[in-house]
């Protein structure tokens, strides 16, 4: 009986297994017949399906080489394990149609990946490597033959990295704060990681004790760095990714503060503080709210040459009328002085003067016979005018203030109400620039004010008919009788003999072409100091006689037009397609020339002459304060004295900095004085000078020319790969381009600078590089890349993995973009 029951049970089980097998077999046959088209079926047979001898996406697995959560910036990898339907390993070297797509969910940014078949015992594993820079949630889709693998898509969260002090900033930053004694002031700090991610998920945001604040008083004891008594508290808000530093000072005076994270100063963490009493604060508020009226302070003027805040001085610079326009530095006070003296008078004792502060200017005047005003100095109320705070003067024991605008020699003043004077100036400055000194806030203020300037002028269309074959001449002719109102209108460009209607395309093309016609060296209006097409352009001091100065006015108006169009936003945004020298940009905003401009503008001259003078003893050199000027045939044309009696004044170790700055003034500014004046005349017709003055020369370039984004596709299309084995060309180069595609614009600029010596491309992009960007297969393995900047060559060794390429390239461009690894 027992055997009978057991036999029945075995038969039933066998029957059920048989039925299951038949159902599975039927399902595979139906799937084979209905769902597999000819292309996907390939050489598979129904027998393969019956045996499960085919690649099945649902049987494959994905394993991750990291544990969640993980920080951005690292080389990440996961593995796709391929299996037949029957569970046997599927050889990955066979074509399987593996597709991996990784994208940021919120930003919709695709991440480049590399695939590599691992030579494991079963050879059924594909390693997928990638790098992410932006924190957030990512979707990872893995497909085989169009079907998702296992549980694909997968979702992974990458957290921001640790706080990087150089990326962390104060919101609404000011170089000088005006506070009230005993009243708290809160500073908003935005912690960022290396890739500018907010640290909302980072432990560093909760590490509030890592933020420190050091304050010392400015004055006679500044060298001793005396600490000041103050109260400080730090809190954080993880939702807004901000840290709040609450500061209270209990003593009046001028101080210097520095905010640090883990003993490293943050990006804009250094600033001055003026602390006023309640009564002084009310006086300053009343001064600033008084519109259009100059507030004056009694002071004593010391000899500017005694000022120690600057190591060098320049001869008097007489501003031309075009540099004064329009209505910025010279306003309501113009009528009250018969003349203006720019040369500081040699005084043995302090001179009693009066300092006037208005919304637009800060002026120093002397009164003759107590009734006749005589203007001694005028400074614009703009970020370029810097104050230095010193201790009491030796004569009257009054607090001292040094004013330096980078144009005139610094002026040293002592004043009983110095702190009120400085606070009035600072508050007026803050009103002038829109309440913040950060670049983006200044851009927003600039564009808002520029729209206000042209608000009453209609932005209706005006037709501009030009010839493509004589673009510059026809454009000059078409705009010859244009008023400022016409330049403010929306240009509708019509190219002769072309029927295209201008819905924006012809206008943008005209801006592109006219910028090239004006600022390319072939027009001879602008020139380079070196023969390299990567060099910056500067007004040409040797322009042909037929190129009239009116053309520089036209160039200035064009730049002003681009700035105005960009202020309108949207489709009107228009960048200036040019790469100007730093010294030319500095002259646009009225800055004084400095020998350091040679380093970027004329690097060959800087290396050959400037560095030689800086690094050598001048006692045995027969060098004088004069410059030899040669003609085109190389013969000496004339000798130009850099100062009165310069041909008889030797250059010594004591005055060589003074000599180099005079040389910069002559070579970079004096030789192109007329060209710059006419350029400014055209520019200031559309853009007031006081608006441009809120930027420095680097910010001005960003405002006019943009960031100059580097296009990876353009890079890849024009880069030339030289030499190399199969491993180098097929694997290392694939890893290299994947790493390059993952780099930020800042990192791409560093890579470009590492290889070419410049962080910017010519207007034509990589195609315009001469010689072309070359990637040379270096005869080394697993070492740092090197570069030959003179030949635009990147020497790339061989590597064993994507992670190694990423690590070595990152190290090279971060540590060596200014010399490390460069040849």
Swiss-Prot record:
EC id: 2.3.2.26
Filamin repeats (start-end): 64-158
Active site: 790 (glycyl thioester intermediate)
One GO molecular-function entry: ubiquitin-protein transferase activity
Pfam families membership: Filamin, HECT
InterPro entries noted in UniProt: E3_ubiq-protein_ligase (IPR050409), Filamin/ABP280_repeat-like (IPR017868), HECT_dom (IPR000569), Hect_E3_ubiquitin_ligase (IPR035983), Ig-like_fold (IPR013783), Ig_E-set (IPR014756)
Record pathway: Protein modification; protein ubiquitination
Region annotated Disordered, chain positions: 315-345
Catalytic activity: S-ubiquitinyl-[E2 ubiquitin-conjugating enzyme]-L-cysteine + [acceptor protein]-L-lysine = [E2 ubiquitin-conjugating enzyme]-L-cysteine + N(6)-ubiquitinyl-[acceptor protein]-L-lysine
GO cellular component terms, semicolon-separated: cytosol
Keyword Transcription belongs to the record: no
Entry superkingdom: Eukaryota
BP-aspect Gene Ontology terms: apoptotic process; negative regulation of apoptotic process; protein K11-linked ubiquitination; protein K33-linked ubiquitination; protein ubiquitination; regulation of inflammatory response; ubiquitin-dependent protein catabolic process
Subunit structure: Interacts with SOCS2. Interacts (via HECT domain) with HTRA2, DIABLO/SMAC and SEPTIN4; in the cytoplasm following induction of apoptosis.
Annotated function: E3 ubiquitin-protein ligase that catalyzes 'Lys-11'- or 'Lys-33'-linked polyubiquitin chains, with some preference for 'Lys-33' linkages. E3 ubiquitin-protein ligases accept ubiquitin from an E2 ubiquitin-conjugating enzyme in the form of a thioester and then directly transfers the ubiquitin to targeted substrates. Ubiquitinates SEPTIN4, DIABLO/SMAC and HTRA2 in vitro. Modulates pulmonary inflammation by targeting SOCS2 for ubiquitination and subsequent degradation by the proteasome.
Protein name in UniProt: Apoptosis-resistant E3 ubiquitin protein ligase 1
UniProt organism field: Mus musculus (Mouse)
